Amino acid sequence: MILPTAYTGLNQLGYVTRDIEEARSTFERHYGIADFFCFEARTEAIIPKGSVNELIVGLAYAGDIQVELIQPVGGDVGLYADVLGEPQALVGFHHVGVMVAGNLDAWNRHRQQFDPAHPVVLEGAVGDDIRFAFTDERPRLGHYIEHVWFSARQAADLEESIPRF
């Protein structure tokens, strides 16, 4: 069971796109989000072991909610690309994001909640500063949940970089 306290950190809506530039344009035209902090990400996963994914990621805030655009570009990206379905779909809803506050021990305690009813389909780390895991909630909710933890330094760096609208 994932405890209700996990959702106190609900802060993100994640979307997958075939074309991040076109998705950015769509979000600007229709939702007033005029800029995204974009970067390329390559991560080697802990689960599934050795899996590598390459993504272009864009982040922006709409009020207190972070909007994430993800363009899969290489490696094992089925977890992301599968939500697009129709060839003409530009953007597909992928996940809600939950930020785990506190130190690394808080992440480890949070991580212990996951069980077979909430399988981890992707998990990884970036050095000592980032931990993330996606649980598959599609049978009940129709989407994934991304659980993420940042060191205080990483969180501060990101906050400075991500535009707010």
Question: Across the structure, where does each feature detected by a protein language model lie?
Answer:
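N-terminal strand-loop-strand beta-hairpin
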Residues: 1, 15, 30-62
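N-terminal beta-strand motif that seeds the catalytic metal site of vicinal oxygen chelate
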Residues: 1-21, 91-100, 160-165
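Vicinal oxygen chelate
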Residues: 1-3, 15, 19-22, 30, 34-35, 62-65, 68-71, 108-165, ...
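Residues embedded in well-ordered beta-strands within globular domains across many folds
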Residues: 14, 37, 97, 148-149
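A cross-kingdom feature marking solvent-exposed beta-strand/loop segments within repeated
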Residues: 37-54, 76-88, 93, 128-132, ...
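Histidine- and/or cysteine-centered catalytic micro-motif in compact active-site loops
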Residues: 41, 72-74, 101
